[in-house]
Amino acid sequence: MKNQVFLWFLEKDLIILHEIFLVMAIEGEEFRVDIDKILKDKLGKKSVLVPKFLVSWLKKILHQEWMNGYLCGNGKGKVGMEWLDGSLDLLNCKLNVQTNINGVLQEGLDALPGNEGGRYFTIVSNHPLGGQDGVALGSIICHKYDSKMVYLVNDILMNFKGLAPLCVPINKTGRNGRDFPKMVEAAFQSDRNVVMFPAGLCSRKGEDGIIKDIDWKKTFITKSVQYHRDVIPVHFSGQNSDRFYNIARWCKRLHIKFNIAMLYLADEMYKNRGKTFTVTFGEPIPWQTFDKSKTPHEWAQWVKGKVYDLDKQPR
């Protein structure tokens, strides 16, 4: 009976991040990660039949106590840039921020233009980590552009109240799928810089052993052209564990649609605490660059190439 419940539990996708990163929030209840509550809400009385080792594993892999220590402690009440900065402190994340303009490295972001004259940018980056990179990039851009930024992100992140005001949720197939185009339009029409990870997934390790983003989606090209936004390419250093890449590789080989590797992102974030990452911003690419000589998809891969070129040491 227990095995049947366990299999049913998996088949019903009750371990998807939408449920694990819940705001289990009725009025007056704090936002917290609560695996026991998730199981009880979804399985009812059958929740007691879920193997205890599985419940313990979920709590461990998601670092439930550690995350709740911040969400219900120092992070409580913080919003936007303050929440991002607090998250970086929690992660003990150190950043080397620089620009690479025409092969010349310069510390800081003084070489980047501001938003004077209503000039707002589309800022695109590779996505090597899935945790620190998103938090750090948001913090950097908030400080540079006076919090005038908005993420286009997976809608599970809307559950983090401190982050939500900076986010436009992406869920093309869920309840908000019908409103997705309108929300993207609103972001690009706004007086904020739009931050995107065009791959939509964390970087993967290829058969050649190289860790790189999958193909980038073309949305940032088409919308940047439509709304006359120059594109700022960003390279973020770092990588996850071999375990993460091996899980992702085997899921692909076995044609498993559920993104099991995503379950491990909280653990990867935990393991990457205390590390130093280099964040390199390139020169803004004029929106007029993206002409008819390439398709939007081809231009997206071209920009992706420019991002990885930023990681190469100037001569």
Q: Where do the protein language model's features map onto the residues?
A:
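Membrane-anchoring hydrophobic helices of lipid-metabolizing enzymes
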Residues: 13, 18-121, 134-136, 164
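Catalytic core of membrane glycerolipid acyltransferases/transacylases, capturing the structured
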Residues: 121-175
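Non-catalytic C-terminal accessory region of glycerolipid acyltransferases
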Residues: 178-315
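Polybasic, lysine-rich low-complexity intrinsically disordered segments
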Residues: 2-3, 12
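Short gly/ser/thr-rich secondary-structure transition/capping motifs
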Residues: 93-100, 176-178, 262-263
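Conserved beta-strand termini and adjacent loop/short-helix elements that scaffold enzyme active sites
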Residues: 98-102, 152-154, 170, 284
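Short, flexible loop segments at the rims of nucleotide/cofactor-binding pockets, characterized by
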Residues: 88-95, 170-176, 209-210
